[in-house]
């Protein structure tokens, strides 16, 4: 069976960037990594309905900058910025560091793989047919400008005795082309029969990596 490499991990440094932008020595790395995981888990749990796709964390000495990519910024910011201020204080209390929070709005959530996966998982939890949820997500993504999409659901689908995987795809999804901008998302649906895993790959077109401009010195003849 062919196993798939993580599409984002494969493209880091080429057309994708890190979600954690900091560096630490061996002594402090473990502590900071666990702090990152706590921050991400806390924000995702607190604002699960806000459609948070990505959380980017940057560090500088005793300061932490958190950028939240969300489809519903109003839900995270709150009325007059109350929610975001509460979140900032809670994170400062948790980490003991100065926290700065930025909000980045996701303009087209229909072609954000993580949000699509979470939406399908939420529908499966509401007992909507997984086939219907997959087909709707695929048609919406293509309508909103995706060049290709692939969705996989794995587990005891429709309460079957034996777990299986089902795929649905349309368009093209070139997984091994490094310049291909492929977004990947994963979510789990908690059903009475057990967990159902949902994976989504969305192809948004080709992106050429930025070439660093080097000054070429020309030698002139005397």
From Swiss-Prot:
GO CC terms in record: cytosolic small ribosomal subunit
Superkingdom field: Bacteria
Gene3D superfamilies: 3.30.300.20, Ribosomal protein S3, C-terminal domain
InterPro entries: KH_dom, KH_dom-like_a/b, KH_dom_type_2, KH_sf_prok-type, Ribosomal_S3_C_sf, Ribosomal_uS3_bac-typ, Ribosomal_uS3_C
GO terms under biological process: translation
Alphabetical keyword list: Ribonucleoprotein, Ribosomal protein, RNA-binding, rRNA-binding
Domain (KH type-2) ranges: 39-107
Pfam families listed in its UniProt record: KH_2, Ribosomal_S3_C
GO molecular function: mRNA binding; rRNA binding; structural constituent of ribosome
The family this protein is said to belong to: Belongs to the universal ribosomal protein uS3 family.
Biological role: Binds the lower part of the 30S subunit head. Binds mRNA in the 70S ribosome, positioning it for translation.
Quaternary structure and partners: Part of the 30S ribosomal subunit. Forms a tight complex with proteins S10 and S14.
Entry protein name: Small ribosomal subunit protein uS3
Native source organism of the sequence: Carboxydothermus hydrogenoformans (strain ATCC BAA-161 / DSM 6008 / Z-2901)
Species lineage: Bacteria, Bacillati, Bacillota, Clostridia, Thermoanaerobacterales
């Amino acid at each position: 069976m062919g196993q798939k490499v993580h599409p984002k991990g494969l493209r880091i440094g080429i057309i994708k960037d890190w979600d954690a932008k900091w560096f630490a020595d061996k002594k402090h790395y473990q502590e900071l990594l666990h702090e990152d995981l706590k921050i991400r888990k806390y924000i995702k749990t607190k604002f699960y309905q806000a459609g948070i796709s990505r959380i980017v964390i940057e560090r500088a000495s005793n300061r932490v900058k958190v950028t939240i990519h969300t489809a519903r910024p109003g839900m995270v910011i709150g009325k007059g910025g109350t929610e975001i201020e509460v979140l900032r204080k809670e994170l400062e209390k948790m980490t003991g560091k100065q926290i700065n929070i930025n909000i980045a709005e996701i303009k087209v959530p229909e072609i954000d793989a993580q949000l699509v996966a979470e939406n399908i998982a939420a529908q499966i939890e509401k007992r909507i047919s997984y086939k219907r949820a997959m087909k709707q997500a695929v048609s919406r993504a293509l309508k909103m400008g995706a060049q290709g999409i692939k969705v996989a659901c794995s587990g005891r689908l429709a309460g079957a005795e034996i777990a299986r995987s089902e795929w649905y795809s349309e368009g093209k999804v070139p997984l091994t082309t490094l310049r291909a901008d492929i977004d990947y998302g994963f979510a789990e649906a908690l059903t009475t029969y057990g967990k159902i895993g949902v994976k989504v790959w969305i192809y948004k077109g080709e992106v050429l990596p930025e070439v660093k401009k080097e000054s070429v010195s020309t030698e002139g003849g005397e």
